Design a protein with these regions (language model features):
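Extracellular and analogous surface-interaction loops
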Residues: 69, 74-75, 240-241, 265, ...
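C-terminal motif of bacterial Sec signal peptides marking the signal peptidase cleavage site
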Residues: 19-22
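Predominantly extracellular/luminal regions of secreted and cell-surface proteins
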Residues: 262-268, 435-472
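Aromatic, loop-rich ligand-recognition surfaces of beta-strand-rich domains
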Residues: 473-537, 561-610
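Beta-rich carbohydrate-recognition and catalytic domains
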Residues: 24-128, 134-236, 241-298, 312-315, ...
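Non-cytosolic beta-sandwich-type ligand-binding/adhesion modules
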Residues: 98, 160-166, 328-338, 346, ...
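Bacterial N-terminal signal peptides
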Residues: 11-17
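Bacterial N-terminal signal peptides that target proteins for export
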Residues: 1-9
Length: 610
């Protein structure tokens, strides 16, 4: 057949139209105008991306111990926004707000005490850590839980509670002088000159009544846990409301022994002391375990940063282990049938380590821990901090966000168990949350087929929502449940929709393994319905994969995970996509070809559309 040229006006780009060969039927082909997110400004470490569609976990907001809350108070001017709090200084806490969980606008100090001559200022003197905030509709108040070290006191990491009418603050310490009692039985209101008494002045602002908490600890056999203090010293508070009952709970981490504790709250200012419970102990799979039995916690004395997530009638505790200064700081998960447990830490075969920098495998991220988990637009996300310096770790950290998916695994008894799986930590380009970009991943709506599938593999892995990430942590779980679609050679993957869909971008995620990775996408074809009602196949040849960004050295030694070849374009109406990929050559990726089981593998395909 003869080829013919036709000119189309498409986004001010000349389009070439060809007559298709085969089947005796003419078909219009239009070369597509697109952007692949791989353009670099001079001297830039990161490519320029369309931030209306995508994000990347760059260093945007320096903050440690992030807590993110949704503003659900309809009276508030920021209703529908998200607020971010964290460890930001000695005497107070800065906060930010966002509409997309990625781009944060500074609001100001939610809590700040500069005058150290006042009791409040002295109480919040140094080492103000890990604020968490919650809104209470009944009281119409926002409450902040945190710890700080009082001025001129022998005690450190004192737990405090503050309140505000707004998530932006100002939060003010709540004064309990009329109701609290010192551990020696003296009511605080009866202590003379309490404002200048360095042993007592700060106790009026504490989260817990000193005497009642002391008695609760004694009941648990923990009266002598801290020989250096007569009041509880604690950090990393987490207020939580059970969605099924409306009951309130408060979790925290003891500064001695690093136990995670939990208790029921009658209100956010009135604990139910008799419910105080040990939730987790470093190294022990359950609080009642007779000896240490968690392999990945044998060399750590840290369990901290509790967060509770409900799912399927169970309660999931996420917590961090190891030193926050180390690359190995990571998030783990445990499960229970009740808010106060008993919680059982998941084994690595069950996915016990949720988020880890995997020091032997990652050169692009470090110290991923102290997380919040929230549901936004129907998708769960984990918000965590990572080190600013990958090489040195330390105290300087920034906020990052990745998706959480739920997968079903077999527990140690062979029973089905839902567990969290993190699509991260990532430093690669990822799609913005749907509620922010207005485009969702519709790939799972398509009927998927492919040529050249390797024995034992399946196209179902291409649209399961799970990004494959090379991990030593949870290695058995990842190898068992997080699958890539493997091919014995060149493949054409077809996604066929039951009707025309509005599509804005395509993401083809590479293999986690260098030996089965692709170098680029040979061709992508979109069967489209044009604005004038006619039909054409729009195509892209040689869609780039940003090999520069996703390899660790010039020798292409390590492939960074959850990375994709991306094409974004003006909206099209499309009912079928065909993606042709060929295995990389030794010249393109020198380590390619090590794997005898699969020459080529693809982790995931995402189609951003409506």
């Amino acid at each position: 057949m003869k080829k013919r040229l036709v000119t189309f006006g498409l986004a001010a780009v000349a389009a070439v139209t060809l007559l298709a060969a085969g089947c005796g039927e003419g078909k219009n082909y239009i070369k597509m105008s697109y952007y692949d997110e791989t353009s670099y400004e001079e001297g830039a470490n990161y490519s320029t991306i369309d931030e209306n569609l995508f994000y990347r976990n760059e260093r945007k907001v320096d903050v440690a111990d992030p807590c993110v809350v949704y503003v659900n108070d309809e009276k508030d001017a920021d209703y529908g926004s998200y607020y971010l709090y964290g460890t930001t200084g000695n005497t107070g806490f800065f906060c930010w707000k966002s509409d997309d969980l990625v781009n944060w606008e500074g609001v100001g100090y939610a809590l700040l005490y500069r005058d150290l001559s006042t009791p409040q200022g002295k109480a919040v003197s140094v080492d103000s850590w890990a604020p968490e905030v919650i809104y209470d509709g009944e009281a119409d108040k926002w409450y902040m839980f945190f710890s700080s070290t009082p001025k001129d006191s022998s005690n450190s990491y004192i737990p405090y509670i503050a309140q505000s009418d707004s998530p932006a603050g100002p939060f003010e310490l709540i004064d309990h002088i009329d109701s609290y009692t010192a551990t020696d039985g003296t009511p605080l209101k009866d202590i003379e000159n309490i404002e200048t008494n360095n042993s007592y002045y700060y106790q009026r602002y504490m989260t817990f009544d000193p005497l009642k908490m002391s008695q609760a600890l004694e009941k648990l056999g923990l009266a002598d846990m801290d020989a250096t203090s007569d009041v509880l010293r604690a950090i990393d508070f987490h207020p939580y409301v059970d969605s099924s009952t409306g009951d309130k709970y408060l979790y925290f981490n003891t500064s001695v022994n690093s136990y995670i504790m939990g208790m029921k709250m009658n209100s956010w200012t009135e604990p139910e002391y008799g419910t105080l419970t040990i939730i987790s102990k470093p190294g022990y799979s359950t609080p009642s375990a007779a000896e240490k039995d968690v392999p990945n916690e044998m060399n750590t004395s840290v369990n901290e940063a509790a967060w509770i997530t409900e799912h399927g009638g169970k309660y999931y505790l996420t917590y961090s282990t190891n030193s926050y200064k180390d690359k190995t700081y990571q998030v783990c998960q445990a499960v229970a049938d009740k808010p106060l447990g008993e919680f059982r830490k998941l084994t690595e075969a069950e996915g016990g380590i949720l988020l880890s920098a995997d020091s032997a495998l990652r050169d692009d991220v470090s110290g991923t821990g102290h997380s919040s988990i929230i549901n936004a637009g129907g998708q769960d996300y984990i918000i965590y901090h990572a080190h600013n310096s990958i090489a040195e770790g330390g105290s300087s950290r920034h906020v990052a966000v990745d998706e959480i998916e739920w997968i079903m695994v077999k527990d140690a008894q062979g029973n089905d168990l839902d567990v969290m799986y993190a699509n991260g930590p990532t430093t690669s380009v990822q799609p913005l949350p749907e509620f922010a970009s207005e485009y969702k991943n519709i790939a799972a709506q398509a009927e998927v087929s492919a040529t050249g599938i390797a024995d034992g593999s399946s196209v179902s892995f291409l649209t399961d929502g799970l990004l494959s990430i090379n991990r030593y942590a949870n290695y058995d779980m990842v190898e068992t449940y997080i699958k890539e679609t493997e091919f014995s050679g060149e493949t054409t993957i077809t996604l066929k929709f039951d009707d025309y869909k509005t599509i804005r971008a395509l993401m083809v995620y590479n293999s986690k393994n260098m030996e089965s990775a692709f170098y680029d996408i040979e061709r992508v074809e979109f069967d489209c319905r044009l604005e004038d009602g006619t039909f054409a196949t729009k195509y892209i040849d040689g869609l780039a994969y940003d090999i520069k960004a996703y390899t660790s050295t010039d020798d292409i030694d390590v492939l960074r995970p959850a990375s994709s070849a991306i094409a974004e374009f003006d909206e099209i109406e499309c009912n079928e996509i065909r993606i042709t990929i060929t295995p990389a050559t030794e010249e393109q990726i020198p380590v390619h070809g090590f794997n005898d089981l699969a020459i080529l593998a693809v982790s995931e395909i995402r189609v951003l559309g409506k």
